[in-house]
A protein has these predicted regions:
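Loop-to-transmembrane helix boundary motifs in multi-pass membrane proteins
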Residues: 125-140, 334-340, 388, 417-455
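Juxtamembrane transmembrane-helix boundary signature
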Residues: 14-38, 60, 90-116, 193, ...
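Membrane-helix boundary/coupling elements in multi-pass transport proteins
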Residues: 67-74, 91-99, 103, 107-111, ...
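Extracellular/periplasmic helix-exit of transmembrane alpha-helices
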Residues: 271-285, 337-373, 406
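Extracellular loop-to-transmembrane helix junctions
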Residues: 2-19, 76-107, 116, 175-181, ...
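Membrane-interface "cap" regions at the ends of multi-pass membrane proteins
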Residues: 16-70, 257, 321
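Hydrophobic alpha-helical segments and their helix-loop junctions in multi-pass secondary transporters
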Residues: 189-194, 208-231, 239-241, 246, ...
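Membrane-interface helix-loop-helix modules in multi-pass membrane proteins
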Residues: 51-110, 121-125, 142, 147-156, ...
Length: 564
């Protein structure tokens, strides 16, 4: 199958899904364009800030779409292009987009609260506590990992085996561009908030700033060491995760969303221009080097089809910015389908290389393979290969930073909500509760632990990220299914995704526990394996406990309707 045919199939399926299935869900759940959203009802100028659809879409899209939809399909391609493509399209439409839409809808109908609050309101306090504790720890792990990855991407120096220190121009350019994005985003935030111009002028200004940042970044690379970047990045996150969303988060993600969209559009043009052939087998085997297609393929592709992290963004930050309930469809459902399109492009990219060709060209990481393929495609229409390769790499590297403060903000909110129940009197709290629910305290303790994890080695437990991420998806689907049932809305479309993701996640965790247990008995105690085993067991117990509570509520015979 050629790249063009794969692209056309994806465009038809994803576009048709938005127009048909997305609107079907909108009608079934009863979207009310006249209802007052939490962005207005709870407006505080910090987290609850109403924003235009394109701005919130930019935040949602830039937060959920980073390296994930590129890395996942390329790694999963060992099973062949057909199962990867089928899961991206089927999973993206019926699993990921439904989860993201349902998470945002449930949040908007509950004052913009997170999935943790939804669990408390419709399942129980114990489930809420377990979920929020898991979310908080998950966010600490992600912040630690992403901060280290970003610092590594920005690192201006590399030392060879002989001890010679060399400047890395590409990293310096990415660093300059990313820092300029932040500076420009602050200015754009004030411009969007206080200007009276229409959205087209605002868009033009955003694109001009985007181009300016890229040009200056390529022209004036900045060289800073890895350790210094760690400090700078955590200082930035500290400010960004408590700053009003209109001042940085909204405009920065708005800028980056255009960069991401331009990359996708350029890639689509490249595919149609080059019409790359597919050099991958349609299907290889259910077992590739000891990796079983079920559940590995579904855990590995993750963001390109369904990711639990998306539910945290949908219910944690984006839901607090929705101006009108009708905007939820393009912001949540639409952003997920756009991410699935990016995943299909990544699959076409890796399939365009013959066996061993990418490695022969020095393309060893997934982003490099993606950038190299797109550069090859666009060179057909005369665009310089080296320039396109640099720009694609720059774009992919910049997106990790966009997710950082969103994750930190969600972590902060999870920590605060852990100590706040729905019946808590926030005006008459104890001194202890006032401290632990303070946004600055919650942010500092979250980031201090993430920084320490960065230094002591998050890599010991990072292999569990895929399973932990999909466990979040299970819990989000359970919470949303119970919410829809308790409020007398149709939620059967969540049941199959919920059961399937339970099977995927619990199987993956079970296989991991079995493998690690055998390793401990054969090789003895090992810090990495021991930590992974402990966390895997805890994740499995947590998932089973919350899932059992949720399933009980789904089958509970109670005709009393809860309002939302």
């Amino acid at each position: 199958m050629s790249g063009i045919v794969m692209m056309i199939i994806a465009i038809v399926v994803l576009g048709g899904a938005y127009l048909l299935y997305g609107r079907y869900l909108q009608n079934k759940w009863g979207i009310d364009p006249k209802a007052k959203t939490p962005a207005y009802e709870m407006e505080d100028g910090v987290d609850y800030v109403p924003a235009d659809t394109n701005v919130v879409f930019g935040h949602q899209f830039a937060s959920i779409a980073g390296a994930g939809p590129i890395n996942g399909p390329i790694q999963a391609a060992i099973f062949g292009w057909l199962p990867v493509m089928l899961w991206i399209l089927i999973g993206g439409v019926f699993f990921g987009a439904v989860q993201d839409f349902a998470s945002m809808y449930a949040s908007v109908k509950n004052k913009g609260r997170t999935i943790g609050y939804i669990i408390e309101a419709y399942i129980g306090k114990l489930g809420k506590k377990l979920f929020l504790l898991f979310c908080w720890l998950f966010c600490i792990l992600v912040v630690a990992a992403f901060a280290d990855v970003v610092a590594g991407t920005f690192n201006g120096f590399v030392t060879d085996n002989a001890g010679t220190v060399t400047k890395v121009v590409a990293n310096g350019a990415v660093a300059t561009t990313s820092m300029l994005f932040i500076i420009e985003a602050v200015g754009l935030g004030f411009f969007l908030k206080y200007s009276k111009f229409n959205k087209w002028i605002n868009t033009a200004v955003a694109i001009l700033l985007l181009v300016l940042a890229i040009v200056l970044g390529l022209k004036f690379p900045v060289y800073v060491s890895l350790g210094t970047w760690h400090i700078i990045i955590f200082a930035y996150i500290l400010v960004a995760s408590v700053a009003p969303v209109w001042a940085l988060l909204q405009p920065r993600d708005y800028l980056n969303s255009y960069l991401l969209i331009f990359m996708i559009v350029g890639a689509v043009i490249g595919v149609f221009a080059a019409n790359p052939s597919c050099n991958l087998k349609a299907f290889t085997s259910f077992n590739v080097d000891g990796q079983y297609m079920f559940p590995i393929l579904f855990v590995t592709i993750a963001c390109g089809a369904v990711s639990g992290f998306h539910s945290l963004v949908s219910s944690g930050t984006a839901s607090k910015q929705i101006k009108n309930e009708k905007n939820m469809l393009p912001v949540s459902f639409g952003a997920m389908l756009m991410e699935s399109m990016l995943a299909i492009i990544a699959l076409i990219a890796v399939a365009s290389f013959a066996d061993g060709e990418a490695a022969a060209q020095g393309l060893t990481t997934q982003p490099q393979i993606f950038a190299g393929a797109i550069a090859n495609f666009l060179s057909v229409i005369g665009l310089p290969h080296s320039l396109v390769f640099t720009l694609i790499n720059l774009a992919v590297s910049a997106f990790a930073l966009t997710s950082l403060d969103s994750v930190a903000r969600v972590g902060r909110l999870s920590f605060q909500e852990f100590f706040l129940d729905s019946d808590t009197d926030e005006e008459n709290m104890s001194p202890f509760l006032k401290v632990v629910t303070n946004k600055y305290f919650a942010t500092i303790i979250t980031l201090v632990l993430a920084y320490l994890l960065t230094k002591v080695g998050y890599a010991e437990i990072w292999p569990l990220f895929g399973s932990a991420n999909q466990l979040l998806s299970v819990l989000a689907l359970v919470a949303c299914a119970v919410f829809l049932k308790k409020t007398k809305r149709q939620g059967c479309m969540l049941w199959i995704p919920m059961v399937f993701m339970m099977a995927v996640t619990f199987t993956a965790l079970g296989m991991t526990i079995s493998k690690l247990t055998k390793a401990l008995f054969t090789t003895g105690l090992d810090l990495g394996n021991t930590l992974q085993l402990i966390f895997a067991v805890l994740l499995l117990i947590l998932g089973v406990l919350v899932a059992i509570q949720g399933v009980k509520k789904l089958f509970e015979k109670n005709d009393e309707k809860q309002t939302a």
